[in-house]
Amino acid sequence: MRKLTLIGTALLIAISSYAGGLLTNTNQHIAFLRMIARGASLQIDGVYSNPAGVAFMDNGLYFSLNGQSAYQTRNIDATFALFPEKTRRYKGTAAVPIIPSAYVVYKHDNWALSGFVGVVGGGGKASFDDGLPMFDSRIMAGIYAASQKTITPDMYTINSSVSGRQFIYGAQLGLSYRLNKYLSVFGGGRMDYFSGNYSGYAIAKLKANSATLTDVELDCDQTGWGITPIIGLDYKNGKWNVGVKYEFRTNLNIENTTKKNSDPDGTLADYKDGVNTPNDIPSLLTVAVGYQFTPRLRATAEYHFYDDKHARMANIPGTTTGKQHALTHGTNEFLAGAEYDVNKMITVSAGVQRTDYGLSNDYQSDTSFSCDSYSIGLGGAVKLTPKLTMNVAYFWTNYSKYTKSTDASSRGGYNDTTMSGTDVYSRTNKVFGLGFDYKF
């Protein structure tokens, strides 16, 4: 009985630890995908990237519809003494066939009313069909200890799977005002709605007689909402344009609606029906400087800062400390892009982005990990008619690997096994986008 209890507890801890971190999506318009640095834009995509700048648009009604298709892989190369192959690869896939967004601007004289709807955060949907290292290592260590080292990994099978879904839908509305020929301001807000699901199971069976050692399940929906106040400023002088935007921190709590929970009053208490977990959207500051070198050539340099350390997050596993305190600093992003008008109909563009997180071992986990990255965007715009423009782009991200080594003497050891182990986290990301801008 002691053996079954230890194994079951290990599985429950592994499942209850599944609570992925939030991602803030800045790639709302296809113009971002093809140029990346759009914080000084004076076109309709500025509704999101430079809302004060829309006050410099010509009078009229504008509408934009965009669609993106994103595909990610999330790999974990785990090294653990009880793995027969020593190092085992766990591959997760995250695919979103369509990420839609829509923009509208009505500009009249010095005033501009603008709105936007889209997916402003979340990690899409991810599935680890073969489970995670935190599952397998805990199960193996539990069996090994409970059997007094008489049951080895070749004597049983483990069948586990984990999947999660996270989306934050946003609806933004605001007003821009042109103070004079150089300066405009913006004030507005965005309503954010979180929708997520986390599910997983783990079954351990002896090979000799197929006896089930444990069978654990979790199926939990999570929802929540919050309001993001937004302010902006734009300064335009000749060939120069400077755009500034600040999004305040969004106080966001997500509530569980649980369908299946093997231990709602025990290790899976965090996923008990009705429980709330903090998942704030961090404040965001963007500053961009654009310059028009020639009537055909334009370029922008930009900086983003996400104040992650002051955004409430779920606790570090095994502690009562929020994960935000484990970060060494907020997220810094450096962006640059340029576009060139080939002729009156065709524009080509490209851009780069460097993202630097303040990562640490306590922040990283199998179910929520990030990696510093470089991104490249390529694409163009085609003026199909005097009123209709098509944007098309390809966006690719190259992630640095993150190595997390855990000694047996550290808090609980590797995945609470009291043994040592190492995880190497890596990711890939590819996005294709197509959008249409129309002026009535």
Model-assigned labels for residue ranges:
Residues 1-19:
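Gram-negative bacterial Sec-dependent N-terminal signal peptides
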Residues 20-37, 41-42, 99, 105-440:
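Outer-membrane beta-barrel porins/channels
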Residues 15-122:
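N-terminal, post-signal peptide beta-strand-biased segments of exported outer-membrane/organellar beta-barrel
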Residues 14-15, 62, 184, 403:
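Hydrophobic alpha-helical membrane context
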